[in-house]
Amino acid sequence: MSSIRSAFLALFFALTLAACSTAPPAGINPVTSFDLNRYLGQWYEIARLDHSFERGMSDVNATYLLQEDGSVKVINRGYDTQRQAWKEAIGRALFIGDSNTASLKVSFFGPFYGGYHVVALDQKDYRWSLVSGPDRDYLWIPARDKQLPVDVREQLVSQARS
């Protein structure tokens, strides 16, 4: 009985780790020549693929703060329209590889991390980006302002679809 239980636990942990993938999805190439210090600060969510953890949320924004240990404190905040209350989630992000490649892993609970990959970025002013999660079902368009020029938004949506 103990060997069956051990096998079950091993399978459970293997599946859990696979579900918490931090590598970029196939075909996704994170931005290189990335400057974390320029990326820090507040970003507003312009568009997203909807998921249960953000469903019904409006005015979503994220703030990234550099910590003394080199990690990044992530503060996600949004207005829950059903409950008519603000919700906040605090997490921690770490670079997966070198700090010049915009590929990080983020955790909002315990040892479980998911990928955060900047795949397009306004390299000149860091005003907008396109972010992929652990797979192509998780995509966001954050920007420094609450609105993006229509042509920029359309370009990012087109890139996200390709």
Predicted segments with their positions:
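Bacterial N-terminal signal peptides that target proteins for export
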Residues: 1-9
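Bacterial N-terminal signal peptides
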Residues: 9-18
